[in-house]
Amino acid sequence: MSDNDFWPDGYRCCVQLSFDYDSNSALVRRAPLDIVAQSRGRFAPNTAIPRILDLLDQHGIKATFFTPGWTVDNFTESCEEIVSRGHEMGAHGYLHERLAELSWE
């Protein structure tokens, strides 16, 4: 197979763009009472995700957002917006658990 047969429409490469959308999920486990840290973690759903989605839309780019289940449970609106704009969501654990500390159950 030649390169011309592999790449459609004259394209010569591809790029996969992904984001880790954690919000404050890691902080909830590590520092649940640190209000300043929790506030910083809310920047993603309230400011960063809308800006990123608008930028991706402007350029016609689709991306994958790897997101912990805790973020989906607690910031449902922003996750639904990601999907409604045609992006993919991927699993990223539930709450940044330390796997070595989890029981087999």
Residue spans of the language-model regions?
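Catalytic alpha-helical scaffold of carbohydrate-active enzymes acting on polysaccharides/glycoconjugates
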Residues: M1-E105
